[in-house]
């Protein structure tokens, strides 16, 4: 090894043994150019360092190796990164979360380029566990996990990180920006959409859309389009966004989503024929946006919505009559819709196969069984937990020096602007 590299290795060993992690972080930040100039010797450097004891030094070397314009032996590098993430010292890594996250982003991008997303899911899961301070902390690599899960069509591993409510963001030494936040909620929304958990999907799209912004984000635009479609499927209308939504949405994003607003407008007429015509009119737009599958589900949901409206008017109805009223092709298609809706608990009905009649029933739920009481109890506990968290966050803000300084300044401005009561 060149003498400069030997000095780097010795410094990493010494600072690691002394527990001087801040100084070690400064060293690895300054050593990027040195390592990049000695690419052929980097495997020797890795051999001289212990992954557990010298995690930050190994991280610096792997980060530089992955930053090369072309990677000569990807399989070897992948194995090195995989071993590092699974065995590195989590406490050390938290001193250089920006570099650690950068390495994970590089790994994700490389696997996406090679069309091998499945290989990275387990590795990125381990990386999140190493980096998180708690399960409710969002990191920039959560979005990487969701992206890999989507591309691999393997949703289950990501659900453990999507089903929790995020209360905190890992600052990553100031390197965290809005894009990974948006990616987590956008990709997460797509995963929930694929699983037909539309309520959770809507929440995730809403988080992406309502992110404070001064400029148009393509991710926010795509989330907005999907928000409209999922809202129609779930509620039969577009749910209004919160008042704190950025003005960027109304000023720029809405005009870029005209086809989707037209779809929502026609959907509200409850006329499937008109909706089909509009889908044909904007077929190219919906296909280009990769939203045609959701658009078809919107059309299907309109048929279901119209069938649900019939339950409020009729006690019994023939399948043929139902088909003509909701504009389905015939009794067979009407029967298919009714059976699916009964299975999903969207209506309560039975079909008499002899005469082809549908009998609609009242909901059997009386809200007096142990399961329902357990659900209510769980919801109450969640509300109590949320209240405790809000109080803790409020207290944290109250004692924040920046907040105190700003609030004191505004109070002085208010008192200075008040007219004197004395002449």
UniProtKB/Swiss-Prot annotation:
PCI domain: residues covered: 197-365
Pfam families: COP9_hel_rpt (PF22788), CSN3-like_C (PF21215), PCI (PF01399)
PROSITE patterns documented for this protein: PCI
GO biological process: ubiquitin-dependent protein catabolic process
InterPro entries reported in the protein's UniProt record: COP9_N, CSN3, CSN3_C, PCI_dom, WH_DNA-bd_sf
One GO term describing the cellular component: cytoplasm
Name of this protein: COP9 signalosome complex subunit 3
Keyword Oxidoreductase recorded: no
Region (Disordered): 401-423
Record's compositionally biased regions (Polar residues): 401-410
Primary role: Component of the COP9 signalosome complex (CSN), a complex involved in various cellular and developmental processes. The CSN complex is an essential regulator of the ubiquitin (Ubl) conjugation pathway by mediating the deneddylation of the cullin subunits of E3 ligase complexes, leading to modify the Ubl ligase activity.
Subunit structure: Component of the CSN complex, probably composed of cops1, cops2, cops3, cops4, cops5, cops6, cops7, cops8 and cops9.
Gene: cops3
Protein source organism: Xenopus laevis (African clawed frog)
Keywords: Cytoplasm, Nucleus, Signalosome
Taxonomic lineage of the native organism: Eukaryota, Metazoa, Chordata, Craniata, Vertebrata
Compartment list: Cytoplasm; Nucleus
Entry's family note: Belongs to the CSN3 family.
């Amino acid at each position: 090894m060149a003498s400069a590299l030997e000095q780097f290795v010795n410094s990493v060993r010494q600072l690691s043994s002394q527990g001087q992690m801040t100084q070690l972080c400064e060293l690895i930040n300054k050593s990027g150019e040195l390592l990049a100039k000695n690419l052929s010797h980097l495997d020797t450097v890795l051999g001289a360092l212990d992954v557990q004891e010298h995690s930050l030094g190994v991280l610096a070397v792997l980060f530089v190796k992955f930053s090369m314009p072309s990677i000569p032996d990807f399989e070897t590098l992948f194995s090195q990164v995989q071993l590092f993430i699974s065995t590195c010292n989590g406490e050390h890594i938290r001193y250089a979360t920006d570099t650690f996250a950068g390495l994970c982003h590089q790994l994700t991008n490389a696997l996406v380029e090679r069309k091998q997303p499945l290989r990275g899911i387990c590795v990125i899961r381990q990386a999140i566990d190493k980096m998180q301070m708690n399960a409710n902390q969002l990191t920039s690599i959560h979005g990487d996990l969701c992206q890999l899960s989507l591309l691999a069509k393997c949703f289950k591993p990501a659900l453990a990180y999507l089903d929790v409510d995020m209360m905190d963001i890992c600052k990553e030494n100031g390197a965290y920006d809005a894009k990974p936040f948006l990616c987590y909620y956008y990709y997460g929304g797509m995963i929930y959409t694929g699983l037909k958990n539309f309520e959770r999907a809507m929440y995730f799209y809403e988080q992406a859309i309502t992110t404070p912004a001064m400029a148009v984000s393509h991710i926010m635009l795509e989330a907005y389009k999907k928000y409209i479609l999922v809202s129609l499927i779930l509620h039969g209308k577009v749910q209004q966004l919160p008042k704190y939504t950025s003005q960027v949405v109304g000023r720029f994003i809405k005009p870029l989503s005209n086809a989707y607003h037209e779809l929502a407008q026609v959907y509200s007429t409850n006329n499937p024929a008109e909706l089909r015509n509009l889908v044909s009119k904007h077929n190219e737009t919906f296909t280009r946006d990769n939203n045609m599958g959701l658009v078809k589900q919107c059309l299907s949901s309109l048929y279901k919505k119209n069938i649900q409206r019939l339950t409020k008017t009729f006690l019994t109805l023939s399948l043929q009559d139902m088909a003509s009223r909701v504009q389905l092709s015939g009794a067979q298609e009407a029967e298919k819709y009714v059976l699916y809706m009964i299975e999903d608990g969207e209506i309560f009905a039975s079909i008499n196969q002899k005469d082809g009649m549908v009998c609609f029933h009242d909901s059997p739920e009386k809200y007096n069984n142990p399961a329902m009481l357990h659900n209510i109890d769980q919801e109450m506990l969640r509300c109590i937990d949320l209240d405790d968290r809000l109080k803790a966050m409020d207290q944290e803000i109250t004692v924040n020096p920046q907040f105190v300084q700003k609030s004191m300044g505004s109070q002085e401005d208010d008192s200075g602007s008040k007219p004197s009561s004395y002449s």
